[in-house]
Amino acid sequence: METHPSIVDTAIASLKKYAVFFKTEITDISAQDLAVEAKLNSLDRIRAGMADVTSETTDQFIPQMLNLDLLDFISFKKGCYTGQEVVARAHYLGAVKRRMYLLALATDSVPASGQTLSNSEGKQLGTIVNAEANEQGQVEALAVLSTSSTEIKTVVLDQTETSVELLNLPYELG
């Protein structure tokens, strides 16, 4: 399992609770796994539409908001986990009102994970999941937005209005 460094300790502690029921051992090998991180850096993951949940965004989203259902990272046929009923209900009723989108922001200031995106009237439009500067001096970001907010042209970040462009993800949002 790959996870963001800011939540490794929390993830391992949670998983160890279940290890007693199975013949398994859970070990943190993140210090040994530097080649994987070099191969798929943060900007590559953003462009691939693969969110990294950080300590700032833990417990803010259900899996469908991060498009994990579209990437086949969720099984709706098996398993038992906290929040399963909410996740299954959203899947079977089709009631997902927020999804993750790939954005290009015309700024050189990289917003933090968990930062709010607002419109000029101060209404919250969404939340930054991950963001990185690109080669053109802009910022590419994954952000969870209301599905009704996808026609936006500008957002307010840190009290500064910034133009925004919705980019295509490498998978369909259905």
Predicted regions and their residues:
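Glycine-rich, small/acidic residue-mixed loop/short-helix segments
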Residues: L66-F73, A88-G174
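Helix N-cap / beta->alpha transition motif
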Residues: H4, Q32, T54, S146-S148
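Hot-dog-fold acyl-thioester-processing enzymes
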Residues: V20, K77-K78, G122
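Anionic-ligand-binding alpha/beta catalytic cores of soluble enzymes and soluble regulatory domains
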Residues: A35-A104
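Short, exposed beta-strand "edge-strand" segments with a Pro/Gly-rich flavor and a Y/T-containing core
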Residues: M1, A48-V53, V139-L145
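Acidic, low-complexity central loop/insert segments
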Residues: M1-G49
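Residue-level signal for inorganic ion chemistry
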Residues: M1, G83, G122
